[in-house]
Amino acid sequence: MKIIFPILSNPVFRRTVKLLLCLLWIGYSQGTTHVLRFGGIFEYVESGPMGAEELAFRFAVNTINRNRTLLPNTTLTYDTQKINLYDSFEASKKACDQLSLGVAAIFGPSHSSSANAVQSICNALGVPHIQTRWKHQVSDNKDSFYVSLYPDFSSLSRAILDLVQFFKWKTVTVVYDDSTGLIRLQELIKAPSRYNLRLKIRQLPADTKDAKPLLKEMKRGKEFHVIFDCSHEMAAGILKQALAMGMMTEYYHYIFTTLDLFALDVEPYRYSGVNMTGFRILNTENTQVSSIIEKWSMERLQAPPKPDSGLLDGFMTTDAALMYDAVHVVSVAVQQFPQMTVSSLQCNRHKPWRFGTRFMSLIKEAHWEGLTGRITFNKTNGLRTDFDLDVISLKEEGLEKIGTWDPASGLNMTESQKGKPANITDSLSNRSLIVTTILEEPYVLFKKSDKPLYGNDRFEGYCIDLLRELSTILGFTYEIRLVEDGKYGAQDDANGQWNGMVRELIDHKADLAVAPLAITYVREKVIDFSKPFMTLGISILYRKPNGTNPGVFSFLNPLSPDIWMYILLAYLGVSCVLFVIARFSPYEWYNPHPCNPDSDVVENNFTLLNSFWFGVGALMQQGSELMPKALSTRIVGGIWWFFTLIIISSYTANLAAFLTVERMESPIDSADDLAKQTKIEYGAVEDGATMTFFKKSKISTYDKMWAFMSSRRQSVLVKSNEEGIQRVLTSDYAFLMESTTIEFVTQRNCNLTQIGGLIDSKGYGVGTPMGSPYRDKITIAILQLQEEGKLHMMKEKWWRGNGCPEEESKEASALGVQNIGGIFIVLAAGLVLSVFVAVGEFLYKSKKNAQLEKRSFCSAMVEELRMSLKCQRRLKHKPQAPVIVKTEEVINMHTFNDRRLPGKETMA
């Protein structure tokens, strides 16, 4: 019998039942959670605690399960396996065990050999393999089931290269841990050919953590710019060993490629001055990231104690952060693929997971803002792209962010954009510096005291005052040490080694060189200099020449011998010209008998002797009874008078100085005079800047001087300025030295003087080791002292001496025989000459009288002498009876000084 329920056939009832069943199914489905398993394989050291990656793996899974925001209907479980380091066989076995259990993805292991084994299995069975450490990828990589959250090292290598270029390094040492380091830093290794970079590559010891032999070798080689490619554990050990070896100073700059530099304990190095730079991918400035790291730290501190790795307690390492982000990225793909189920896979059957390809595509397409910033993958090779790195550097407050780097825009240094005011004392405040110097008066000298002095109190001088002012401005303390070899610093041509203060700066035995250290080209190539605190040049120190009294003929000195000769020639020439013109000019002839105007005899006063007498009278400013009548002769006379006026005035003006002032005649007046002679020896301080100047000079004069000095190196080059000054005083020696020191010496020793001007121009600066961060600070402080006038005041303090007594004025000094004795000699010579001439005239006249009176020469001479000795009138000699001569003959006769007037008739 068939029972019929009418209500079941009711359409409304049917719709209601369907709705209730649908609601029940929805409620059941919402109350049911899907379980998904992740696999993790982690290396461990035997008897060691759980690693950071495994802790982060578990922490991430637990966080997702607790929050229920990412996977509200899925519960994640995990299976973790531990393997020994570098055990690829065990890694393969553990991977197969997890695949047989059924896992959606396998995380780890980290090391390349084990990772490659697991990757091979995952790729064959279609299960995603997630890596958080760098692994070398070949160009034809076919591992499609692989992603890595670690930044691509080709990008990291470019970031390091950008840092090197930013710091303007010219020499770099790369220290790597294993052979993969050369692959990771390939962009940097290719740089020398493109960026003029000198690269030195070293490898850390593989079988020990003792890096001291390597560090010692680097210290000996003065390798101050170093890039370390190693783990954070090794980095912590290197820093400790470098500190013990004195390599944690401001002259060293280390770049670490590990992204865990921020997690190292840098407390012992904060005030060492060392420059330490690295990268950080963990976005600690994000508040959500900071909250997660804080929770991680709490759980991390509850974990078993870890061995001493140099890491700060509770800090999340980069590997841990990447593992945390990896779990979340895979979870994002799970969220987008809810119908995915896992199944047991067997390694020996080679049957891939049917959801693997789709799931792997979702993982590569996933985007996530995690602890390490933006996470996106290259869909072809699975490598991470488009990430940001923070550039961090060690400061006194610890590691601070100073910039950012990303693959698109490169390096962006933001340290100067923090809004902090510039403070030049930041890197020098409260630091203790070693200062090398050299004894050189007045720059550095021992302080005179009755009590024993110690330390810096032993010294005083210009450079000591300068150092004290710099320390006041910059806030540093210092210890003064005298240079061991007592030299400034020069390079040996044979081996290229330096000595003196320059050597101590190169070897970092001193932080500063505050001394009269000249800034030169060759020194600037090996050390750094501040701006000059004093400018100067090379000059010549020589004995002040002894004064020479004027000689008896010093009245001739106002005019040079050439001028005297020219005056004599001019006198002779003018006298002859006057004689000739007077003979030719008709207006110079006159009638000797003005009472007889009809006389045809005329005479000319300017005979040859009278012409010479006229010239002498004008030259002596005395004149003569002879006066020119013609215009032509007057022109000659006027020009001669003007000439003698200028000559006599110039002579008179200079005569007083030459007769009253002692002449200081020096055998040398310039460097050219030194180079042209060999009698006076000359030299400089050995291995000093002055010697180097002549040694490197290409100017012929200075090159010739260096040839002289080098040929007599043992005898002319001295050890110090004091030795050179003493030699100038005691021998015929000229000392080449700085003009400022010459100025100081001549103020205190009146027997010395500076010869000539400056040979070159240079400056004294504060020396620092190459690349020292102190140079710019000291330069600013020196400029400040210069603007305040303190440099000038210090120079006045140390250069101002008692001075040499001024020479007494000799304007009113009486002239002695030694001054004008020559004039008396000339007078005496003139008198003697006149006597001889008078005797000659007497004899000549006596002979004429004897001929005229027809008697003997002796009687005529006696008669002439008798008449000359009488102080009465003398009678004119009467000649014999006149001889009758015809009128025509008388008219035609005339002397050399007269002539007959033209046009007169012959006398009858």
Curated annotation (Swiss-Prot):
The chain crosses the membrane at residues 562-582, 636-656, 820-840. SUPFAM superfamilies: Periplasmic binding protein-like I, Periplasmic binding protein-like II. There is a cross-link at residue 886 (Glycyl lysine isopeptide (Lys-Gly) (interchain with G-Cter in SUMO1)). Sumoylation mediates kainate receptor-mediated endocytosis and regulates synaptic transmission. Sumoylation is enhanced by PIAS3 and desumoylated by SENP1. Ubiquitinated. Ubiquitination regulates the GRIK2 levels at the synapse by leading kainate receptor degradation through proteasome. The keyword Glycoprotein applies. Disulfide bonds join 96-347, 750-804. It is found in: Cell membrane; Postsynaptic cell membrane. L-glutamate binds at residues 516, 518, 523, 689-690, 738. Keywords: Cell membrane, Disease variant, Disulfide bond, Epilepsy, Glycoprotein, Intellectual disability, Ion channel, Ion transport, Isopeptide bond, Ligand-gated ion channel, Membrane, Phosphoprotein, Postsynaptic cell membrane, Receptor, Signal, Synapse, Transmembrane, Transmembrane helix, Transport, Ubl conjugation. The keyword Phosphoprotein applies. Expression is higher in cerebellum than in cerebral cortex. It comes from the Eukaryota. GO terms for cellular component: dendrite cytoplasm; glutamatergic synapse; hippocampal mossy fiber to CA3 synapse; kainate selective glutamate receptor complex; mossy fiber rosette; perikaryon; plasma membrane; postsynaptic density membrane. Glycans are attached at residues 67, 73, 275, 378, 412, 423, 430, 546, 751. GO terms for biological process: behavioral fear response; chemical synaptic transmission; detection of cold stimulus involved in thermoception; glutamate receptor signaling pathway; inhibitory postsynaptic potential; intracellular calcium ion homeostasis; modulation of chemical synaptic transmission; modulation of excitatory postsynaptic potential. PANTHER family: IONOTROPIC GLUTAMATE RECEPTOR (PTHR18966). The postsynaptic actions of Glu are mediated by a variety of receptors that are named according to their selective agonists. This receptor binds domoate > kainate > quisqualate > 6-cyano-7-nitroquinoxaline-2,3-dione > L-glutamate = 6,7-dinitroquinoxaline-2,3-dione > dihydrokainate. Belongs to the glutamate-gated ion channel (TC 1.A.10.1) family. GRIK2 subfamily. Ionotropic glutamate receptor that functions as a cation permeable ligand-gated ion channel, gated by L-glutamate and the glutamatergic agonist kainic acid. L-glutamate acts as an excitatory neurotransmitter at many synapses in the central nervous system. Binding of the excitatory neurotransmitter L-glutamate induces a conformation change, leading to the opening of the cation channel, and thereby converts the chemical signal to an electrical impulse. The receptor then desensitizes rapidly and enters a transient inactive state, characterized by the presence of bound agonist. This is Glutamate receptor ionotropic, kainate 2. It comes from Homo sapiens (Human). The gene is GRIK2.
